[in-house]
From Swiss-Prot:
Catalyzes the formation of succinate and glyoxylate from isocitrate, a key step of the glyoxylate cycle, which operates as an anaplerotic route for replenishing the tricarboxylic acid cycle. Required for growth on ethanol or acetate, but dispensable when fermentable carbon sources are available. Also acts on 2-methylisocitrate. The keyword Cell cycle does not apply. GO terms for biological process: glyoxylate cycle; tricarboxylic acid cycle. One of its GO terms (molecular function) is metal ion binding. GO terms for cellular component: glyoxysome. This is Isocitrate lyase. A motif (Microbody targeting signal) lies at residues 538-540. Homotetramer. It is found in: Glyoxysome.
Length: 540
């Protein structure tokens, strides 16, 4: 086959692939030829693509039934094997990886300053464990006659799809392409990426979040899909927006962000940066410097343009104040994507004069623009991201059902088919946020709004911490009575297979391989005569 014929065949295969229902709602800005020309000669099949297909079908079924796949962040293979018995997806958290699994071995808060391969490595760690326990289970079941297997419980599906945290992509667009490739190669079925700026990225529940313009994040989503297309993967992409609580943005270049960029409304206040530099030159620092900034904020009257317009109307002698404000707000809304120049021109036409509004004056010392997000801001971004993402996720400050409903309805009014994701964050105080009864139904209520995938980011971390604290305390006080009574016996009572940890770890499976390659005879089998796990045969 000629080089050209091979290329033509590749293009036709890609066209056929993209015409499947899987991509019905996906927008691509490049052609099949673009992808085919960037593929290698050898096709490397990715098992993670099978997992992506599995995840997509799983979420389709949940959407159909108005239910949700709900899961939490897994720390290690022990947690994954236990989760697989009850939950239908697995989450890998960047926060947990930052604190417990950085490839630099240096723990850190969730600032995405760990090495780029940290979360992909954790995905591979869990993916290999999933594959191993799946093989182990198959061998154990198939070693029995079919008549006996029919009496066993259904096998555990250890191959639950993994969704992982890609943070902001760890750099520019080429970094996003490479990071996506890592996740595909290491077993991820889906990844999420947020619209914060790299370098200033924070945990979704920290202060000081800096957004990138809408188009910049769309470019990241396109880069994810392009990378997955090059490597022949159906990887799911989840677009997260941190705009609900964001206070800064890197640039004013995208008109879709203009409504939410705040500016100074008092010309006499000057520029914040100039005022702060002057104060530093005077020797002010710490609390004194903060006081200077607070005073500038008070004097400058920093607000959004539509607020400045309303204040100007209300302060004037206009006879039709309500009508003027209503006419302006009818045309300039959180979802209208009105460029600032058009909003200013409309205001000038309605008032007969220009309003002083200067977002350059309000820029902070790092150069970022002031930004006032909120739920409608997140809706606007969610709609913009929808053509490039399989799911949309708004990070929020509280587990607020009314807010979740506002976001879901706002996005779905524009994009009815859109799947949504929700962070059931442990950063929320669930006992003060809602009653136990509401806690029990929260997932199902969100599912009815279209949140088909929900997750507790750090439940693996917190369950690990709780049992470790509880056992360490009891062990220090009661010695082996604590282990026997609070760990081992409950394992037996609950039927937790890890009580027989040698078997759980695959000792019998490996012994079987050893016998297979030695002709059926070996004196060094790990589970032979004398293994202490025989003590548990009557118990489990």
């Amino acid at each position: 086959m000629s080089e050209q014929q091979r290329f033509n065949n590749e293009v036709e295969e890609i066209k056929k692939w993209w015409s499947s229902p899987r991509w019905k709602h996906t927008k691509r800005v490049y052609s099949p030829e673009d992808i085919a020309s960037r593929r290698g000669t050898i096709k490397v099949p990715q098992a993670s693509s099978q997992q992506a297909d599995k995840l997509f079908k799983l979420l389709q079924e949940h959407e159909k039934n108005h239910t949700a796949s709900f899961t939490y962040g897994a720390l290690d293979p022990v947690q994954v094997t236990q989760m697989a018995k009850y939950l239908d997806s697995i989450y890998v958290s960047g926060w947990q990886s930052s604190s417990t699994a950085s490839t630099s071995n240096e723990p850190s808060p969730d600032l995405a300053d760990y090495p780029m391969d940290t979360v992909p490595n954790k995905v591979e760690h869990l993916w290999f464990a999933q594959l191993f326990h799946d093989r182990k289970q198959n061998e154990e079941r198939l070693s029995l006659p079919e008549s006996e297997r029919s009496k066993l419980p259904a096998p555990v599906d250890y191959l639950r799809p993994i969704i992982a945290d890609a943070d902001t992509g760890h750099g520019g667009l080429t970094a996003v392409v490479k990071l996506t490739k890592m996740f595909i190669e290491r077993g991820a079925a889906g990844i999420h990426i947020e619209d914060q700026a790299p370098g200033t990225k924070k945990c979704g529940h920290m202060a000081g979040k800096v957004l990138v313009p809408i188009q910049e994040h769309i470019n990241r989503l396109i880069a994810i899909r392009a990378s997955a297309d090059i490597f022949g993967s159906d990887l799911l992409a989840i677009a997260r927006t941190d705009s609900e609580a964001a206070t800064l943005i890197t640039s004013s270049i995208d008109y879709r962000d203009h409504y939410f960029i705040a500016g100074a409304t008092n010309k006499d206040a000057g520029h914040l940066v100039d005022v702060m530099v002057a104060a530093e030159l005077e020797g002010k620092q710490g609390a004194a410097l903060q006081a200077v900034e607070d005073e500038w904020n008070r004097k400058a009257g920093v607000k959004l343009f539509h607020e400045a317009f309303a204040d100007e109307v209300n302060a004037g002698s206009y006879s039709n104040k309500a009508e003027l404000i209503a006419e302006f707000n009818k045309k300039v809304t959180p979802l209208s994507n009105t460029p600032a120049l058009e909003a200013r021109a409309l205001a000038a036409r309605l008032l007969g004069k220009d309003i002083y509004f200067n977002w350059e004056a309000a820029r902070v010392r790092e150069g970022y623009y002031r930004y006032q997000g909120g739920t409608q801001c997140a809706v606007n971004r969610g709609i913009a991201y929808a053509p490039y993402a399989d799911l949309i996720w708004m990070e929020s400050k509280l587990p607020d059902y009314a807010q979740a409903k506002e976001f879901a309805e706002g996005v779905k009014n524009a994009v009815p088919h859109q799947w949504l994701a929700y962070n059931l964050s442990p950063s929320f105080n669930w006992t003060t946020a809602m009653s136990p009864e509401d806690q029990e139904t929260y997932i199902s209520r969100l599912a009815k709004l279209g949140y088909v995938w929900q997750f507790i980011t750090l439940a693996g971390l917190h369950t690990n911490a709780l049992i470790s604290d509880k056992f360490a305390k009891a062990y220090s006080e009661r010695g082996m009575k604590a282990y026997g009574g609070e760990i081992q016996q409950p394992e037996i009572d609950q039927g937790c297979e890890v009580v027989k940890h040698q078997k759980w770890s695959g000792a019998e499976y490996i012994d079987g391989i050893l016998r297979m390659v030695t002709g059926g005879i070996t004196s060094t089998a790990a589970m032979g005569a004398g293994v202490t796990e025989d003590q548990f045969k009557s118990k489990l």
